[in-house]
Amino acid sequence: MNTMNSVLECKELALYGGSFDPLHKAHLAIIEQTLELLPFVQLIVLPAYQNPFKKPCFLDAKTRFKELERALKGMPRVLLSDFEIKQERAVPTIESVLHFQKLYRPKTLYLVIGADCLRHLSSWTNAKELLKRVELVVFERIGYEEIQFKGRYHPLKGIDAPISSSAIRASLGV
């Protein structure tokens, strides 16, 4: 993982937010493939305190952050941020985007999301403003049909790990 200073020098920034509840190998594959797709980008991994579209998290924010910290240690061009966790509330994506745009002033800001999120993107807080401010990087989700999206995006294909956090929690009876 890099320091904040290395982010300051970056012209391309990507945000990958999520609950990471729990963290699994598909999350890590998405990070690796984003870095391959965008070779000059600095990637900020942004665990949510609470996803506004989901039930409260199974694992507390501190535990999820520590899991990510261990998993991302030594990964070049990756920074773990506790911005949303520190808010202690559900943070709309546009708020995080505005925060990181103000903080780092990147020329390009990418937002990494799952294809399943495209289905309800229009219901996100200030969705139109969000789409003006970011370029989407969309990863396919196994088990989800291909979604027709009229906007421009960078596809991430071949995430071979079909495991979802929801499936892991269900297998644990949670």
Swiss-Prot record:
The main enzyme category here is transferase
Q: Which domain of life is it from?
A: Bacteria
Quote the Pfam families the UniProt record gives. CTP_transf_like
Q: Could you tell me which SUPFAM superfamilies the record lists for this protein?
A: Nucleotidylyl transferase
The Gene Ontology biological process terms listed for this entry are: NAD biosynthetic process
Give me the reactions it catalyses: nicotinate beta-D-ribonucleotide + ATP + H(+) = deamido-NAD(+) + diphosphate
Enzyme Commission no: 2.7.7.18
Extract the GO molecular function terms from the UniProt entry: ATP binding; nicotinate-nucleotide adenylyltransferase activity
- Record keywords, A-Z: ATP-binding, NAD, Nucleotide-binding, Nucleotidyltransferase, Pyridine nucleotide biosynthesis, Transferase
* Pathway annotation: Cofactor biosynthesis; NAD(+) biosynthesis; deamido-NAD(+) from nicotinate D-ribonucleotide: step 1/1
Write out the function statement from the record.
Catalyzes the reversible adenylation of nicotinate mononucleotide (NaMN) to nicotinic acid adenine dinucleotide (NaAD).
What NCBIfam families does the database record attribute to this sequence?
A: cyt_tran_rel, nicotinate (nicotinamide) nucleotide adenylyltransferase
Q: Which family does it belong to?
A: Belongs to the NadD family.
Name assigned to this protein: Probable nicotinate-nucleotide adenylyltransferase
**What is the organism of origin for this protein?**
Helicobacter pylori (strain J99 / ATCC 700824) (Campylobacter pylori J99)
Q: Which gene encodes it?
A: nadD
